[in-house]
Amino acid sequence: MARNVSTATLTPLLPDPAEANGAAVIVAPGGAFRWLSMNNEGWKVARALADRGIAAFVLKYRLQPTEPSLDDFRERMSQGFGPPPSSSEPPAGEAPPRPGRSDLSNQLADAEAAYAILLERASEWGVDTDRTGMIGFPAGAGLTMHSTLHSKTMTLAFIGPIYGGMGPVEVPEDAPPMFNVLASDDFLFRGQFGVIKSWFDAGRPVEFHLYQNGGHGFGLGYPDAPATAGSPSSCTGWT
């Protein structure tokens, strides 16, 4: 886990040159923009991609500051990060309230810088710039989507927002193909499929996997939710 990141880094995990297929992925771990799940949603994902011939680049982007003490941080997060109380459920037929928009200017700048580095060093790393995409997990999924919708410098070939926000968005005409994964028992899932419908209605390619079990934060999959373990193969096969 990483916290209080004030300087972004980009770490490449490259495939065996004999197995490389030219595709590249920026991997953005999640953690509510307060910490980063570097192992479960960063290094493990990057290694799985590299094992399948895809150059992976783990982006450790800037975060909101948190308490210096790990104990204090855990206590704060336990109070503010959990399943919504039943009283917060909207009336039948009404969509849940959308969360307030966060300022992601720093994180977007970090993603744009990572993309620029990939373009600059593509030949060195054996990367096909026309096959460079981005995947992210929860907050990283939000950053992936934010980059897709708002960046003026990134031209992503594909995106994979994994168990991220599902609300509807305004899809650009040139939006990249999207691969989306979610578990139905994710405590943050509110029964919305807006982003999927938005992509579909815009006529842009989209593939969506809804697993019955897996909860939130399953990364590459849990042993007790074997279906989720297929997500890396599904994603790499899709790219």
Model-derived regions: residue spans:
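N-terminal cap/lid segment of alpha/beta-hydrolase-fold proteins
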Residues: M1-A20, D51
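C-terminal catalytic histidine-bearing segment of alpha/beta-hydrolase fold enzymes
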Residues: L13, F200-T239
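Short beta-strand element of the alpha/beta-hydrolase
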Residues: N21-G30
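Short amphipathic alpha-helix adjacent to the substrate-entry channel of hydrolases
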Residues: N39-F57
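Alpha/beta-hydrolase active-site loop
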Residues: D72-S123, P232-S233
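Primarily recognizes the serine-hydrolase "nucleophile elbow" in alpha/beta-hydrolase
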Residues: S102-A175
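Short beta-strand/loop motif that positions the catalytic acidic residue
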Residues: F179-L182
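Acidic catalytic loop of the alpha/beta-hydrolase fold
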Residues: S184-R190
